[in-house]
């Protein structure tokens, strides 16, 4: 599998998803620095996203990854996507994940519309990171991409 970076605002659910994809469904602690797993995937701090003074750190961190997974809470009506981020990652596969779909104030339809307007494409994944079946949809999708690319099939953004 290629290297993945998880990006999104503070509290979006990046670390919870990062952990869930590794089979860890315990409560996530706040990410204070860039963290890596055994495969080299990267969990980025939300501060990199929320504060323009940290954009350079975010851009530098994303240089060597193959895929961006953008995590946006279904209970967050605003886009905080740094200007130009999708352009920087134009050669990288970009996947949008709508997290926190189980929250009482979640508005999945509005979040999907916001992400489409921002420039993300389908498929998008609606997740409750504490529900293994919900997370499995993303796991299966990532595995299918890997299998296609290993078989030499072209996928969107494959090189």
Swiss-Prot record:
Keywords: ATP-binding, Bacterial microcompartment, Kinase, Nucleotide-binding, Transferase. GO terms for molecular function: acetate kinase activity; ATP binding. Pfam families: PduV-EutP (PF10662). ATP binds at residues 8-15. Pathway: Amine and polyamine degradation; ethanolamine degradation. It catalyses: acetate + ATP = acetyl phosphate + ADP. Its EC number is 2.7.2.1. It is found in: Bacterial microcompartment. CDD domains: Ras_like_GTPase (cd00882). One of its GO terms (cellular component) is bacterial microcompartment. InterPro entries: EutP_PduV, P-loop_NTPase. GO terms for biological process: ethanolamine catabolic process. Disulfide bonds: none annotated. A putative bidirectional acetate kinase that may drive flux through the ethanolamine degradation pathway under anoxic conditions. It may generate ATP that can be used by other enzymes (EutA and EutT) in the eut pathway. Belongs to the EutP/PduV family. This is Probable acetate kinase EutP.
